UniProtKB/Swiss-Prot annotation:
Belongs to the CinA family. This is Putative competence-damage inducible protein. SMART domains: MoCF_biosynth. It comes from Lactiplantibacillus plantarum (strain ATCC BAA-793 / NCIMB 8826 / WCFS1). PANTHER family: NICOTINAMIDE-NUCLEOTIDE AMIDOHYDROLASE PNCC, NMN AMIDOHYDROLASE-LIKE PROTEIN YFAY. SUPFAM superfamilies: CinA-like (SSF142433), Molybdenum cofactor biosynthesis proteins (SSF53218).
């Protein structure tokens, strides 16, 4: 079973609005086990719309059109489809009553063109618009593709698709193989390196699709499998998931489209009841701001320090002036002293520090992008790690924060490993 989604609207082609409708529909089709290999966007032009309808009908079992069902002159979708099907437009009485009632209730004059919103192609099943006026339709054909008409406004489309269209599609096409996907998230490895290391696994896969995607400062893998039940698809993906972790496990930190490294790390710390503070120089509070975005962080984060100037490092977190004079502010010794000093000042379980050169110039002979991150973790020896980041000033600061979170992640995982 194969479907194509056609989004109608010149405003989409001009980039004036984002086409979220096609994304929403595609996800719903995947849940129903209906494949979708094409998505088309076409402007409000009868001839071009007619052409894309004809092309879509030739290569698909189902064609879904969204947009162009309203009362204005550029709303041409249902008229164009009716012409293609060689059927008339008929009125849905329930929709018409709703339209007239709305104008009467709001004491407004109803113009004749509003009646267009109650029309749908003859022979189709009308679909109620619970959040608007334009009626949708599901047309089943014996000799051609089937058609689904949905409104353009996203809040109207979502409700109609979920409550009206999906049940009809399920009833019409019966049980289809379901597509199940899982997103794996990685930090500390590039997309190219991840793909290279997993290439033998990717090449041998037939039942599970492995697709890498580069995100800001991280990489994700989307694993997809198709089976008659979600349980069967999960089983297929579980096997590949295990093989991926066996190959690049140290870089893996979590699952999900909406997950993030900071959410994963802070939730682990909350669960472990480990308190944290930070002393920040080049990041100037960005680490604390980042962890502050996670709900519930107040349970483990009493506060922290922005120690941009050398005097602040000495006064706020007790970094000995002798260390700064001897080793320099961008050094392993200074990073360690900042982390342990912050931890002692607020009596937390963990102290983390950031000192480095955000750029664009050098500092103490150190080039831009040189960063030391210190970590005082529970009763373990204080350590620090050096990094060299590329990018502009803001990118270096953001990458420093991500590296600090990853340093914390590894420390937390060491705790977990020791308990096993």
């Amino acid at each position: 079973m194969q479907a194509e989604i056609i989004a109608v609207g010149t405003e989409i082609l001009l980039g004036q609005i984002t086409n979220t409708n096609s994304t929403y529909i595609a996800r719903g089709l995947a849940e129903l086990g209906i494949d979708s290999y094409y998505q088309t966007v076409v402007g409000d032009n009868r001839q071009r719309l007619s052409t894309v309808i004809e092309i879509a009908a030739q290569r698909n079992d189902l064609v879904i059109l969204t947009g162009g069902l309203g009362p204005t002159k550029d709303d041409l979708t249902k008229q164009t489809l009716a012409h293609y099907l060689n059927v008339a437009l008929v009125e849905d009485q329930a929709a018409m009553q709703k339209i007239t009632a709305w104008f009467a209730t709001n004491d407004k004059v109803m113009t004749a063109n509003n009646r267009l919103q109650a029309l749908y192609p003859a022979g189709a099943q009308p679909l109620t618009n619970h959040n608007g006026m334009a009626v949708g339709a599901f047309y089943q054909s014996e000799n051609s593709a089937d058609f689904l008409l949905l409104p353009g406004p996203p809040r109207e489309l979502a409700v109609m698709f979920d409550s009206e269209a999906k049940p009809k599609l399920a009833a019409a096409y019966g049980e289809q193989a379901q597509i199940y996907s899982r997103v794996m998230r990685f930090y500390g490895i590039s997309e190219s390196e991840l793909a290279t290391r997993l290439q033998p696994l990717i090449d041998e896969q037939q039942a599970v699709t492995i697709a890498p995607y580069a995100k800001t400062n991280e990489v994700t893998l989307r694993l997809s499998a198709q089976a008659m039940t979600e349980t069967a698809a999960r089983g297929m993906i579980d096997k590949v998931d295990h093989q991926i972790k066996a190959t690049v496990g140290p870089y893996f930190y979590g699952y999900g489209d909406d997950n993030s490294l900071v959410t994963t790390v802070i939730n682990q710390m909350i669960a472990a009841k480990l308190s944290i503070t930070a002393a920040e120089s080049l990041t100037a509070g960005l680490f604390q701001s980042t962890i502050g975005s996670v709900s519930g962080v107040s349970a483990i984060f009493p506060g922290g320090f922005v120690t941009y100037a050398n005097e602040a490092k000495h006064q706020l977190v007790n970094v000995p002036q002798a260390i700064i004079d001897a080793e320099g502010v961008v050094s392993e010794a200074t990073a360690k002293a900042m982390a342990s000093g912050a931890k002692q000042q607020l009596n937390t379980d963990v102290g983390i520090s950031f000192t480095g050169v955000a750029g664009p110039g050098t500092l103490g002979g150190q080039p831009a992008g040189t960063v030391w991150i210190g970590l005082a973790y529970r009763d373990r020896p204080v350590k620090a790690k050096q990094y060299h980041f590329a990018g502009n000033r803001q990118q270096i600061r953001e990458r420093s924060v991500m590296a600090g979170l990853d340093l914390l992640r590894h420390a937390l995982n060491e705790d977990t490993d020791l308990k096993k």
